[in-house]
């Protein structure tokens, strides 16, 4: 098992906890910055050197920014990290997934996806920036990516099952850092008791999507309680926009352009950031 992390110290801390419960599992920490496509390619190259099948890939990274920020490659930070980084990593590791007797990809989204109006790949520079709107768009992009990858998985020429999951409203670093309003609500006793669940419970839908034998291609898992905020992990419905196959196909095409990663095995050159729905940029 490899933990791909941006912060080595936190990664090593997580690895110690893994080894405490699974001491015989070969495990390691490797550095990855999903906001830098060169870092994504470097990790994929290192992993290919092992020449071993990959049985499970969990696309779990997520960032939130209250102000407009950019990735190394010039994309809006949240869609660039939360979606494009995962899209590129999964595509570059696809041959290793296909080489496994049975492999699974789990894309972690958020309840925020249901509030998004677009998948948020890029934005108009002159438009007011709304951090929550951009975050929600990146999480919708996660679901559209998972759904489209599930449809395209047979073309990978392997037994690869793709599913998605969300943690409900879990008490995590990401949630408490989304501004004083949400942070105060999360730490309030009433919210902690009635609405918010702990990190372990929040991880349950992801674990079910990753390990349950009855997972079907395109499944989506989340808490089964009211509003999917908390509760036991169950199969849940995708938000309406996440079921839009034309939107998913358009996002896929633009993601290939923006990352330079072609899942059919033909590398392309990144064309740089552009808003979804705009004409692709070209060069002469």
Model-derived regions: residue spans:
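Actinobacteria-biased recognition of intrinsically disordered, low-complexity terminal regions
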Residues: 264-284
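Rossmann-fold NAD(P)H-dependent dehydrogenase/reductase core
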Residues: 1-179, 258-266
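C-terminal helical subdomain
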Residues: 138, 189-236, 245-249, 253
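Short, solvent-exposed polar/charged micro-motifs at secondary-structure junctions
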Residues: 38-41, 229-232, 275-277
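Pocket-edge positions in alpha/beta enzyme catalytic cores
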Residues: 3, 32, 194, 240-243
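Short, flexible, mixed-charge acidic loops at enzyme active sites
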Residues: 118-124, 177-182, 222-234
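A short C-terminal helix-loop "cap" of Rossmann-like NAD(P)-dependent dehydrogenase/epimerase domains
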Residues: 125-126, 181-191
